[in-house]
Amino acid sequence: MPKASDIKKNTAIEYNNNVYIIRDIERSVPQGRAGGSLYRMRMYDVVSGSKIDQTFKDNEMLPLADLVRRNVMFSYIDGEQYVFMDNEDYTPYNLDKDSIADEILLINEDTQGLQVVLVDGAPVALELPSSVELEIVETSPSIKGGSATARTKPAILSTGLTVQVPEHISTGDKIKVNTAEHKFMGRADK
């Protein structure tokens, strides 16, 4: 059983006899009192979809729920549902657009390393690899000699996400984006 300080985003825990998926974690260190950090977690009930915010002490033990991760590929959009296909047995998994709103801006048909998180056989979350490769569809023209300085410019990617890129990067380039911070990491390997 891990401590609250060891819990990561998209972890499933059992709390008050329900299974919740952790969508967001904020760490705070209270001033003027002894003790450790506090972790405020935004959790969604995997059955009803209801949201709760709960605060835990850093050393509080949280029981993990039984979950399974399956490697998948993004397949298609069906209304408000995003459909992912299991890489091994081709089982389709539907995830609601709202439940994966943060991840949508980082996936396309070519994204590799996606995993669907299943609790009791039902898909509840999508886990991204640490980085994804996306194409720049719009940015200001590249500046000759721009690699000599550390200045950046905004670039709109094929998924609609906007990231800051170095001035020498141009429209049409494929870049690596850090999925946790939504930041430019470098040019993608050709």
Swiss-Prot record:
InterPro entries: Elong-fact-P_C, NA-bd_OB-fold, Rib_uL2_dom2, Transl_elong_fac_P/YeiP, Transl_elong_KOW-like, Transl_elong_p-like_YeiP, Transl_elong_P/YeiP_cen, Transl_elong_P/YeiP_CS. GO terms for cellular component: cytoplasm. GO terms for biological process: peptide biosynthetic process. PROSITE patterns: EFP (PS01275). Disulfide bonds: none annotated. It comes from the Bacteria. SMART domains: EFP, Elong-fact-P_C. Coiled coil: none annotated. Pfam families: EFP, EFP_N, Elong-fact-P_C. GO terms for molecular function: translation elongation factor activity. Belongs to the elongation factor P family. This is Elongation factor P-like protein. It comes from Psychromonas ingrahamii (strain DSM 17664 / CCUG 51855 / 37).
